[in-house]
């Protein structure tokens, strides 16, 4: 079978050209024609993990991003079973990241992993890697970029320092101790899972701050328009703004309550230190297999605030996590207070507008009362004049001054005017009329 032209060498191509010039070769070429190969399909953007090719399983696959502590990153299309096997989590914990329960923020601490579900940040963190759900979403991209920019630099620093640790000199043991401090200093006192949790809380807080700033600017503009003109359109804009603030407040309150719950639960805080447990298991295994090796330890009394930690993780990790969560708890509390301030500003403006509307309504009621009193006086005068006018003598259509008709009309008008004045005086003294 003849090969395609793309795989022929230069000499073979020349021979093929000379062979094709003869009539016999033309007949052979018509017999041995090779059909053109179709173009290969484009490579998929992500690897597909998980067993089964059914439509149901294909529908359950979701996009994940895997990032390890050395900066290795890849996109994976997989189902829950693959994620459960890789992270060591039971299936019930993965339901927290599902579409039904994703609206309830939670931070779950398990034996081998930590599940983070904070608004748009949904991730599974182990001691060595992090799995981020839906990394291409618009609101998740800042968090993903933060991770990708941070951990490659950290891995380079750790690699350089660990290379320095393996160099031998006259003071070998002292050099190992100093390098151990440098490794921990390169990590900024935070284990891998603490750094991911730090970035997740930071991304959520930045999103909240951005949202409340936008709502604050919108509130100022909307309320200014409302004070100028109380219309249906402006009232609808205020109602929509209050609904957005209510949803944001509920979201911030849920995240704040979750952080507060972890701060109050020391056992849950200890379970979050997955790196400490993994490192302790590795150190125990190394001690059993190689008892002659010495662990890099330090007995310095310098506090944690100096930025130096021991190589073997200790209970100070829980203290570091406590300070980290407490800082974000205060930040979330500040965001909640900002929401309360904006809501109070809206409520105060609504109260001011309500006072103005009440004042206008009182003015209208005063005007209505004035018109009613005046109409009452005119109606009485008209009724009396109409009832008794036929019994008053007159000389045709020419009325003469001094006849009973003029006296009667004057007396009736004076009486009605007196009644109107009395009614106005009563309304004025009882503050039924506006000033």
From Swiss-Prot:
Topology of the protein relative to the lipid bilayer: Multi-pass membrane protein
Q: Which UniProt keywords apply?
A: Ion transport, Magnesium, Membrane, Transmembrane, Transmembrane helix, Transport
Q: Per the UniProt record, which residue ranges are transmembrane? A: 369-389, 408-428
**Do the record's keywords include Membrane?**
yes
Q: Which CDD domains match?
A: Mrs2_Mfm1p-like (cd12823)
- Coiled-coil annotation reads none
Q: Where does it live in the cell?
A: Membrane
Positions of region (Disordered): 19-54
List the Gene Ontology MF annotations in alphabetical order. Answer: magnesium ion transmembrane transporter activity
Name the Gene3D superfamilies on file: 2.40.128.330, Magnesium transport protein CorA, transmembrane region
Record-level GO cellular component terms: membrane
The entry sums up its family as follows:
Belongs to the CorA metal ion transporter (MIT) (TC 1.A.35.5) family.
Q: What does this protein do?
A: Putative magnesium transporter.
Q: What is this protein called?
A: Putative magnesium transporter MRS2-H
The gene name on file is MRS2-H
């Amino acid at each position: 079978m003849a090969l395609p032209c793309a795989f022929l060498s230069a000499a073979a191509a020349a021979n093929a050209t000379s062979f094709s010039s003869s009539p016999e070769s033309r007949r052979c070429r018509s017999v041995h024609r090779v059909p053109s190969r179709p173009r290969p399909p484009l490579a998929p953007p992500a690897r597909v993990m998980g067993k089964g090719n059914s439509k149901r399983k294909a529908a359950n696959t979701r996009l994940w991003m895997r990032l390890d502590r050395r900066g290795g990153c890849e996109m994976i299309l997989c189902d829950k079973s693959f994620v459960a096997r890789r992270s060591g989590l039971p299936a019930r914990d993965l339901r927290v990241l599902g579409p039904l329960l994703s609206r309830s923020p939670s931070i779950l601490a398990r034996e081998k992993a930590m599940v983070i579900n904070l608004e748009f940040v949904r991730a599974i963190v182990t001691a060595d890697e992090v799995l981020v759900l839906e990394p291409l979403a618009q609101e998740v991209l800042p968090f993903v970029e933060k991770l990708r920019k941070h951990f490659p630099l950290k891995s380079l620093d750790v690699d350089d320092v660990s290379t320095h640790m393996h160099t031998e000199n006259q003071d070998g043991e002292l050099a190992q101790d100093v390098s151990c401090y440098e490794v921990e200093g390169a990590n900024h006192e935070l284990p891998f899972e603490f750094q991911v949790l730090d970035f997740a809380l930071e991304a959520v807080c930045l999103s909240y701050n951005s949202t409340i700033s936008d709502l604050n600017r919108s509130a100022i503009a909307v309320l200014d328009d409302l004070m100028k003109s109380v219309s249906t359109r402006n009232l609808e804009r205020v109602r929509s703004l209050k609904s957005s603030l209510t949803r944001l407040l509920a979201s911030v309150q849920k995240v704040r309550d979750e952080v507060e719950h972890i701060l109050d639960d020391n056992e849950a805080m200890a379970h979050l230190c997955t790196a400490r447990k993994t490192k302790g298991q590795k150190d125990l295994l190394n001690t059993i297999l190689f008892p002659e090796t010495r662990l890099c330890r330090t007995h310095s009394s310098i506090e944690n605030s100096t930025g130096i930690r021991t190589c073997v993780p200790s209970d100070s990790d829980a203290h570091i996590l406590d300070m980290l969560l407490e800082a974000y708890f205060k930040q979330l509390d500040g965001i909640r207070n900002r929401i309360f301030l904006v809501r109070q500003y809206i409520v105060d403006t609504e109260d001011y507008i309500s006072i103005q509307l009440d004042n206008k309504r009182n003015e209208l009621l005063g005007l209505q009362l004035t018109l009613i009193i005046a109409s009452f006086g005119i109606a009485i005068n008209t009724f009396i004049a109409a009832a008794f006018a036929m019994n008053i003598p007159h000389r045709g259509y020419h009325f003469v001054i001094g006849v009973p008709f003029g006296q009667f009309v004057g007396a009736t008008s004076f009486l009605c005017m007196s009644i109107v004045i009395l009614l106005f005086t009563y309304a004025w003294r009882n503050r039924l009329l506006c000033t």
